[in-house]
Structure formats: C-alpha cells, structure tokens
Amino acid sequence: MKTKLSDVVITGGGLAGLCLAKQLKQAHDDLDIVVLEKNKFPRPQAIAKVGESTVEIGGHYLSETMGLKDHLQERHLRKFGLRCYFGKDGQFSELDELGPSKNFSIPTYQIDRGELENRLFKDVTDLGVRIEQGTATESIHLNGNIHQCVTNTAEKQQTTFEAPWILDASGRQGLLKKTLGYQKTNSHKGNAVWFRVDKRIEIDSWSKDEQWHQQCSPQKKRWLSTNHLMGAGYWVWVIPLYDNITSIGIVMDDQVVQESGFDTIEQTMDWLAVNQPLCANAIGSAKIMDFIKIRDYSYDCKQVFSSDGWAMTGEAGVFTDPFYSPGSDFIAISNQYITSLVSQSKQGKNIGFDAAIYQKFYQSIYASTLSLYTNQYGGFGDRRMMSMKLLWDFTYYWGVLSLLYFRGSLTNISFMREASLPIIEIREVNNRLQAQFSEMAKLRIIRPTKGVFLDQNNIPVLRHLNDLLKEPGDVNCIVQLNKNIALLKRISV
C-alpha cells in the first residue's frame, strides 16, 4: 500500500470540500492540500444534489469569499427571494402569497451544483490543490500529530494519505463523525422526496391575471424565486435550474408521510395531483430525471471542531432543514472557523481555546436555526401563522447572524465575548416566539384563501436590515448589533 503525506487532507470534493480547499489556499498558498473524491470530474450539469438555492450568507460566501460573483451572474440564476403560496384550488392568482415584489439588496442565487463544482474544481487545481478523483475513503485513523485516511479505487488500488489535519466534507456520509462515534439525533423530524424534470416550470404561467403579474417588478419572474407551495405538515419546492431544468421537492412531517405513500415517483405524482394539482399539471408529461427520498433528514453532531487536527464542515457535521435553504450558510460558517483554526495552528499558536469557543458558537447557531422548524410543520398551511413567522425569522436572521457574518465578527472572540449577553437575550426571545409558533402549528389550520399578497418589500424593517448588510465590514458592529436587537425586541412584543 502506498503512503502519501500532505499538510491537509479533505475527505469529499463536493461544494463544502472544494470551497474549503480554495479558502485554505487563499489564506496560505504554501499549504499542501489533497482532496479525496469518490466521483470524477467534470460533473454533469444539473447533477442530482439537493442544495440548489442560497440565502444571504451562502450567496455572499460564494460571490465574495470564493470570488465567484461573475460566474454566479453568468452561469446561474439570480433568485427572486423566497415565496410562499397558500391554497390549492382555483386560479393561482387567487391563492394567498407571501413574498417580495422586487429583489432585496443582497443577491441570492439558484445554483446548478454541477456547473458550480466544475468551476471550483478548476479554481482549486489551478491553485495547486491535488484532487484524487475516483478515490473512496474507507477508513480514518486519528493518531496524535499525523492522521491517516485509507482509500481505495475502482481498480482496487489502496493508498494511505497522511496529514496533521483531516477535514471531513463527506456530506451525509459523515465519515469522521462515524469514526468518532459522534452521531447525535435532534428533536426535529422531517422527511423529503425530490426529483428534477427536463422542463422549465415558470410558475407565472399558472395565471393569466395581468393585475397579479403587475404586482412584481420585473413582471412574470416569480419563477426565479424559491417557490414554496404550502400545506398543513408539508411544503413543496419549485426551484429553477440553469438550462431549462426544474427541481421539485416535497418536504413533510411524519403525519403526512404516514397518511400518504411516497415510496415511488408514481405515488408522489398521485399525491401532487390531489394536494397541489397546479404543480402536477405543470409537470405534465415532462421526463422525470431522477427520484430521491430520505426519512428523518435532520441530525446533530457531538463536536465538529477540534484542536487535535480534525474538523467537519457542512453536512458532514450537522443538518437542520431545507425550508430556508441554510445549507450553504453552514458551509460558509464552518469553513470560516476551520480556516481560522488551520491558519493559527500553522503559525504555531495553541488553538485549544479557539476550537472550544468556535464549537460553542457553531452549536449555538445550529440550535437557533433548528428552533425555526422544530414542531412547526403543522402550521405551514396557516397563512396567518406563516406571515408572522416569516417576518420574525427574516429579521432574526438578517439582524443578528447575517450581520455578524457580513462584518467578519464570527471568528473575533473578543467581539463575540462582548456581544454574548445581547445575543443570549435575543436568542431567548426567539425561543419564546418559536414556542408560540409550535403551539399554533398543533392546530394544523388551513384558512380560506383570499387572494392576499403580503409584499415583504412593504415592510420597512425587512428593507432596513437587508440594506445594512451592504455596509463595509469595518463599520462598528457592536453598535449596530445592539440597535438591531433593540429593534427585534420591539417587533417581538
């Protein structure tokens, strides 16, 4: 068996692993980095990977930190916000709608994962990162100062890769987490099926009501949103991808799964025909390109960062829920923490304290994000509950976590120590409100539709908090954070 030595080994060459390799190389171009990837490049376009939509943190990370702004604008789609529809019968324009009439300041994107990962592959190989394609990681051994990854190829060629840093980006496979026995369940139970069709589904075509089209600017571009078709215990996503392909998913609580069968695409289409007939009709005879199902998709991890030369990023560590598209946010945040730890270690610093603090921060972010979903799916068909929930969840996300990320404060331990008390206070406010939403969700209310359009652009606090993210990172963050938290407290009453 051959042995190869490097500074860093990253297990997994998907979005999380490629971004981490690039970020580490940007910080230290002399780092010898190896990425172990079981599949090969180039990826096919519109590859079957969930995680096709970004929100503000993930979009900023890809655009600015990864330097992909031009690529995102040229090869992917500018997202027209998150949009929720309530009801299923009659004209689409007669349903109730929560969403923006125009884009907010900070761009977000609908991304083709194959296209994006191919670009990142080129970027990191140009920077000198070695990507071992067609190489499956069979086992990980943590051995003090030098760790080992034992790999195999389709040709049965075994190799041991050694490095002082093993960084796991293996996604739901969770290689390092399983090695350590750090799997951990949580209190949120969610299930999903998703598939792609070889057809651009433009949700605007579901209504011919010109007055409805005129509500948004630009007109007839609602299809660029992450469109959510809402119901008691479930939501259906309709996400456009590049090159006239559409991703469709159904995300549901256990009660919906028990009431309906989703084991096959035929069962899924039958369910759509009853519960979201407009969506089923739009799919029509389009070719189903794939079909994926997963039960109990949400999970935790006992620890994701260590001073002993290992860490996990993205879904290799934790996963909350797809509703607000937070996957690329968690990649951005975990990669930022990992890059800081590797950089400090390279400089000869003791990183024990920093690793422990980053773990605490990250676990707090995870818990707050998880609270947005736990025991709340029953209320997803309730327009009144969701209008209040989206207002709070957006302000909480933009006003606190997004501000800290955009200002570069999450790895500033002295700042986070100063900010800890107000953050704890607003987290308690969030927990109180989420508990109220959970109580409302138990009723599984479906209200009669009234053709209401709740325009998020008409809510001044949303525009204000999103606009603040455009300010430069050197603007005093603690002052703005305290102002934002005071504003959120007033909203919560």
Give, region by region, the residue ranges found by the protein language model.
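Beta1/beta-strand and adjacent pyrophosphate-binding region of the FAD-binding site
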Residues: 2-16, 34
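Redox-cofactor binding/interface segments in oxidoreductases and associated redox assembly factors
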Residues: 11, 168, 312
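Glycine-rich FAD pyrophosphate-binding loop
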Residues: 25-50
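N-terminal FAD cofactor-binding segment of flavoenzymes
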Residues: 43-89
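Short beta-strand to alpha-helix junction loop
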Residues: 101-122, 257-263
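Predominantly flavin-linked oxidoreductase catalytic cores and closely associated redox partners
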Residues: 123-278, 335
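FAD/FMN-dependent oxidoreductases across multiple families
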Residues: 232-234, 240-242, 256-380
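C-terminal helical "tail/cap" subdomain of flavin- and related membrane-associated enzymes
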Residues: 341-493
